[in-house]
Amino acid sequence: MLTYPNIDPVAIHLGPLQVHWYGLMYLLAFLCAWGLASYRTKQRDGWTSDMVSDLVFYGALGVVLGGRIGYVLFYEFDKFLENPIWLFQVWTGGMSFHGGFLGVMIAMLFWCKKYQKTWFQTLDFIAPCVPTGLMLGRIGNFIGGELYGRAVTDPNYPFGMIFPTDPLHLVRHPSQIYQALCEGLLLFIILWWFSSKPRPRMAVSALFLMGYGVARFVMEFFRQPDADQGFILFGWMTKGQILTVPMLLIGLWMMWYAYQKKIYDWGPQKNS
């Protein structure tokens, strides 16, 4: 069994001001996205560092607003009905990937209109930069002792640990680390490699949807469902899995469509 490091969830103390690791990870995620996207401008015609800075700003707004609103609508709508002001109490925690994803999609529409880029040109460009942010977010969850995994059933399992925030004090899967490695690091490597060569428009975005969909669906088997949600469908599917299925199906269709149309935005096959 592993020992939980029990890191102080507050990274920086400045008098009454406290900066939590989870918030710091969001900042690092946006900085990583900016750095990676800036590097990608060297390989793509028609992209500049100013465009990337604006793109990351729009994306950050989409993540924060969409993530919070999505969490409230998907997971805590009853609490919102009881106290609508709770929506704005972001310091109490609660962000949804699926809500953040939708928020980014909407934000990208405004950015595309400003810079005269198509939606999928933009998504294909930025998609490989996203998994590092997902990885850092899950590390933030781990440090905060939240969203831990299900109880370990095998007493000889070497990677289980007891989280101080778990009222039952059971040996659990460190599912945040599993997700950081699969939805974050592994997906980043796959997308970065795939996008390093010219691909049809929509193909990179499609691979992101499929890759995240598969990784999240599998990781949900290790993650403890929210106490007020439990298993929603068939006695074993969680809310996270239900929300991920459409992403996977849309990604499959997009990949098929991309290779049917074969529209290239860069490289020797670029369409004029």
Swiss-Prot record:
Positions bound to a 1,2-diacyl-sn-glycero-3-phospho-(1'-sn-glycerol): R138
Signal peptide: none
Keyword Transport: no
GO CC terms, sorted: plasma membrane
TM regions (residue ranges): 17-37, 55-75, 90-110, 125-145, 174-194, 202-222, 230-250
EC number: 2.5.1.145
A GO molecular-function annotation: phosphatidylglycerol-prolipoprotein diacylglyceryl transferase activity
Purpose: Catalyzes the transfer of the diacylglyceryl group from phosphatidylglycerol to the sulfhydryl group of the N-terminal cysteine of a prolipoprotein, the first step in the formation of mature lipoproteins.
Family in the record: Belongs to the Lgt family.
Protein name: Phosphatidylglycerol--prolipoprotein diacylglyceryl transferase
Lineage of the species this protein comes from: Bacteria, Pseudomonadati, Pseudomonadota, Gammaproteobacteria, Moraxellales
Gene: lgt
